Amino acid sequence: MNQENTQIVAAFYKFVSLPDFAEKQEPLLAYCLAQNIKGTILLAKEGINGTIAGSRLSIDNVLSYLRSDLRLQDLEHKESTADTPPFERMKVRLKKEIVTLGLPEVDPNEQVGAYVTPEEWNELISDPEVIVIDTRNDYEVHIGTFQGAQNPQTNSFRDFPEYVRQNLDPNQHKKVAMFCTGGIRCEKASSFMLSQGFAEVYHLKGGILKYLEQIPPEESLWQGECFVFDERIAVVHGLEPGTHELCFCCGHPLAEEDKASLQYEEGISCPHCFDSLTEDKRMRQQEKWRQYQLKNSHSLGNSKLGVAD
């Protein structure tokens, strides 16, 4: 990796009351643009959620700018690197929620489960009395998860409450441990679980990314790669880039075996979308792929890239 061109990728979030969040949008965007930062930051009444990339100095400046607000002075972030810019532009968006559960009454600023550090995580999820739940979407779980974790098979985080109502019982499932990419979804999920009467609710502090950063492979209970919402697509231990790519048609992460399938055609289809392609859709996709190649873009422009939502 060329150290001079190395991009620092910083991911952060914090649940904190920000009643003036809309007023922060334009100044924050202007500051990020002045620092040549790219990525996405979400602002809502319940807090902030973002992933940004840029030079070492620019990232440090933006994080200092954010922490100059006393409500964000203890804002934690996770870092990784990329050898090319992982985002095309800078966006600061106003949202109802910084991660969309669809239940405004669930407020992590009021109550959350117990934080578990990466060093404590293995012991917790090895307890046979603990049910371990991956709160991410099915396409993320598909490429990697923790040993023994339950996959709710959700298409979006909004589906998680229904999964809980249909499959979990506070009287039967006494201890619940949850995890997600960076910690934000499992933190909000823990608040929801407590509101549903679950007594012992735990969540992985810093998420999978912090675990992969701190826990050596020989001690790890993680299996596979971790999907990330930028053009690296996936990372492994040490937060090094993984091997997955995105299907240009449906956006599903693809492993090498997916690309070896007879149902895979670059830019057109993969095993996850092949059966849903009518002849008309295939023709439109072929034209879309042709136009993409003509533009010689360096970005997939896929809707899955940005921040976890």
UniProtKB/Swiss-Prot annotation:
Residues of the active site: 180
Swiss-Prot/TrEMBL keywords: Oxidoreductase, tRNA processing
GO biological process: tRNA modification
EC number(s) reported in the record: 1.14.-.-
UniProt cross-references to CDD domains, sorted A to Z: RHOD_YceA
UniProt xrefs under Pfam families: Rhodanese (PF00581), UPF0176_N (PF17773)
InterPro entries referenced in this protein's UniProt entry, alphabetically: Rhodanese-like_dom, Rhodanese-like_dom_sf, TrhO, TRHO_N
Domain Rhodanese, first and last residues per copy: 126-220
Reaction catalysis annotation: uridine(34) in tRNA + AH2 + O2 = 5-hydroxyuridine(34) in tRNA + A + H2O
Domain of life: Bacteria
Gene3D superfamilies in the cross-refs: 3.30.70.100, Rhodanese-like domain
Enzyme class: oxidoreductase
Keyword Oxidoreductase attributed: yes
An MF annotation (GO) of this entry: oxidoreductase activity, acting on paired donors, with incorporation or reduction of molecular oxygen
Function, as annotated: Catalyzes oxygen-dependent 5-hydroxyuridine (ho5U) modification at position 34 in tRNAs.
Family: Belongs to the TrhO family.
Record-linked NCBIfam families: PRK00142.1-4
Protein name: tRNA uridine(34) hydroxylase
Gene this chain is encoded by: trhO
